[in-house]
Design a protein with these regions (language model features):
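Intrinsically disordered, low-complexity segments
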Residues: 21, 38, 58-61, 114, ...
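N-terminal export/targeting and maturation segments
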Residues: 24-80
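Short linear interaction motif-like sites in intrinsically disordered regions of transcription factors
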Residues: 2, 40, 78, 97-100, ...
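Extracytoplasmic electrostatic interaction patches
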Residues: 83-145
Length: 145
């Protein structure tokens, strides 16, 4: 084998190893703005004011993640969010908190409306909460966790 081929194989191997190492690292932040950006893939819109946030993405290629977000928004923004994501008010009340440890700041009371994507699916734990009086919202969204 020529030296050129050996060098090429070494470079490809090195790039492959580097790719595997980088793609196997989790993403984790307790910064609300970064959490929003990792989750949404976009900048924070002017209509919302971030208060707290946490985001964790597993190192797996399947893109498993968990988001906790507290923010304030106007009613119009949240209504559009509910419609776009096809959320409905949770009337069943599944134990969506039972499989996760919520951050200490993730606290709602009975004034919050709780929305879900599919409340009949006992394994669908993502919830979207809004206090219509204060405009405070919480998002707990999980995929594959």
């Amino acid at each position: 084998m020529s030296n050129l081929k050996i060098e090429l194989i070494k470079k490809i191997t090195l790039i492959g190893i580097a790719f595997l190492l980088v793609s196997c690292l989790p993403i984790e932040t307790k910064n609300a703005e970064k959490a929003y950006k990792y989750w949404s893939g976009s900048e924070v819109p002017n209509e919302i004011e971030l208060i707290k946030g946490e985001y964790y993405q597993s190192p797996h290629f399947s893109l498993e993640y968990e988001l906790f977000l507290k923010f304030k928004s106007d009613e119009k923004w949240f209504a559009e969010f509910v419609e776009y994501n096809r959320l409905e008010i949770d009337t069943i009340g599944n134990d969506w908190k039972g499989w996760t440890e919520l951050p200490e700041w993730f606290k709602s009371d009975r004034d919050f409306l709780i929305y879900s994507k599919d409340q009949s699916d006992q394994f669908e734990r993502s919830r979207y909460l809004r206090n219509p009086k204060t405009g405070i919202n919480y998002i707990y969204e999980t995929v594959g966790m």
